[in-house]
């Protein structure tokens, strides 16, 4: 039976870290912090007149960071949000998808770090 896709592909991350567990932990902690900051920024942008340039820059940064650690579903959601271009109401469903996907990533990272202790 195939294992469901995980929010973060640790094997992908391992290819970049040489399987260094300590480095994986550091990268995942840093990503979680930065992701929360970017999500806060996107929520702020979506709650008012979203600045299209800031929306695209933030979603683009999130897309690259997520894909870099192996959080491909989050990276794909960020790519879709980037296409929304910052215009309301188009950003609202994109933001909801980002919230759902990022929450799964946060939980995965939290459990991964807990299991390593």
What name fits each language-model region?
Residues 12-26, 57:
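Short, charged, low-complexity loops and linkers
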Residues 2-8, 27, 31-39, 65-80, ...:
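Amphipathic, coiled-coil-like alpha-helical segments
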Residues 37-54:
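Helix-loop segments that flank and shape redox-cofactor active sites
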Residues 62:
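An anion-binding catalytic pocket shared by soluble metabolic enzymes
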Residues 17-18, 47, 67, 83-86:
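Alpha-solenoid HEAT/Armadillo repeat architecture
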Residues 23, 50-57, 86-93, 97:
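A structural signal for alpha-helical segments
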């Amino acid at each position: 039976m195939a294992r469901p896709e995980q929010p973060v592909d640790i094997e992908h991350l391992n290819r970049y870290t040489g399987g260094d567990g300590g480095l994986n932990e550091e990268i995942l902690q840093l990503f979680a912090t930065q992701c929360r900051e970017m999500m806060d920024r996107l929520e702020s942008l979506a709650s008012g007149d979203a600045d299209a340039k800031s929306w695209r820059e933030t979603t683009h940064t999130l897309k690259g960071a997520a894909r870099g650690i192996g959080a491909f579903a989050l990276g794909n959601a960020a790519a879709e949000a980037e296409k929304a271009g910052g215009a309301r109401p188009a950003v609202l469903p994109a933001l909801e998808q980002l919230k759902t996907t990022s929450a799964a990533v946060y939980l995965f990272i939290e459990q991964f770090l807990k299991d390593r202790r």
